[in-house]
Structure formats: structure tokens, C-alpha cells
């Protein structure tokens, strides 16, 4: 399971004319699900995302996690993250989980964020979405379990 996390001052996702999720300061989480992923991996990744200390403390050091910084989370499904890009000029998506498994684990990941007390907004699984964000820093990390 892969999370590309970005520290943002604002982020939103829309499907057509509908805004399905919007946050102020916090984390935009692009979430990719691989074939061998399960709830245990989703739990570990959620703990890591929410605990990752990438927000500045009073001294300007990256020392606070999103909860300590008072932020929110916007989770967007991203089936291209597990792509195999090692050869050729076209990505292969054979590493990605089938849609039913991916959606179940995406929904589970979101539920774990909410259960941890995080204000959590989402995109719409498998929809064509437009994501807008203001990356703060920029600060972007690739987390993989």
C-alpha cells in the first residue's frame, strides 16, 4: 500500500461540478492499493501517515504530526501509484489491486483515519477527479508498507 502525502495549506477534490472533499491546512493523501495489501497493511500505513512528523514546531523544525498541528486529511484514491514504470514508455498497472479489493481497502483506510479522530474528507473512488492543492513547503513524501 502506497501513500503519497503532501503537506498543504488547502486542498480540494471535485467530481464534475461537485466538490466531494475540501480541507484547510493538513495532508493530501494520494492512496494506491497493491495486490498483496490487506487491512493489516492499511492499519500500519494509516498510523504512519497520521504519525509522520512533517509539520513545523515553534522552532521551525519538522517535529509535529498532522493531529498535533491541528490539521485535516483529504484522502484521494490513486490507482496509478502502484504502476510498474521500470521499462518501456507505457506504465503497467498489473501491481495494482483489483477494483473491489482496492475500494474495500481505500474505504477501510478512510475509516481508520476517522476512528483516530481525524477530520477526514475524500474523493470518490474510481471517479475522474480534479484535485487542487497548495503544497506547503513544498513538502511531499512517498510512504510504502
From Swiss-Prot:
Pfam families: Tyr_Deacylase. It is an enzyme of class 3 (hydrolase). The keyword Hydrolase applies. It comes from the Bacteria. GO terms for molecular function: D-tyrosyl-tRNA(Tyr) deacylase activity; Gly-tRNA(Ala) deacylase activity; Ser(Gly)-tRNA(Ala) hydrolase activity; tRNA binding. It is found in: Cytoplasm. A motif (Gly-cisPro motif, important for rejection of L-amino acids) lies at residues 137-138. GO terms for biological process: D-amino acid catabolic process. Its EC number is 3.1.1.96. Homodimer. An aminoacyl-tRNA editing enzyme that deacylates mischarged D-aminoacyl-tRNAs. Also deacylates mischarged glycyl-tRNA(Ala), protecting cells against glycine mischarging by AlaRS. Acts via tRNA-based rather than protein-based catalysis; rejects L-amino acids rather than detecting D-amino acids in the active site. By recycling D-aminoacyl-tRNA to D-amino acids and free tRNA molecules, this enzyme counteracts the toxicity associated with the formation of D-aminoacyl-tRNA entities in vivo and helps enforce protein L-homochirality. Belongs to the DTD family. This is D-aminoacyl-tRNA deacylase. It comes from Cronobacter sakazakii (strain ATCC BAA-894).
Amino acid at each position: 500500500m502506497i501513500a503519497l502525502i503532501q503537506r498543504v495549506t488547502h486542498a480540494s477534490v471535485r467530481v464534475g461540478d461537485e466538490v466531494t472533499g475540501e480541507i484547510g491546512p493538513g495532508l493530501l493523501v494520494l492512496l494506491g492499493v497493491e495486490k498483496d495489501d490487506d487491512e493489516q497493511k492499511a492499519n500500519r500505513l494509516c498510523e504512519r501517515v497520521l504519525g509522520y512528523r512533517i509539520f513545523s514546531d515553534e522552532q521551525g523544525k519538522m517535529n509535529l504530526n498532522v493531529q498535533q498541528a491541528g490539521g485535516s486529511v483529504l484522502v484521494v484514491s490513486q490507482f496509478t501509484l502502484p504502476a510498474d514504470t521500470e521499462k518501456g514508455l507505457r506504465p503497467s498497472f498489473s501491481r495494482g489491486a483489483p477494483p473491489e479489493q482496492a475500494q474495500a481497502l481505500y474505504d477501510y483506510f478512510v475509516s481508520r483515519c476517522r476512528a483516530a479522530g481525524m477530520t477526514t474528507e475524500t474523493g470518490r473512488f474510481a471517479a475522474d477527479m480534479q484535485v487542487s492543492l497548495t503544497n506547503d513547503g513544498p513538502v511531499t513524501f512517498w510512504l510504502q508498507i
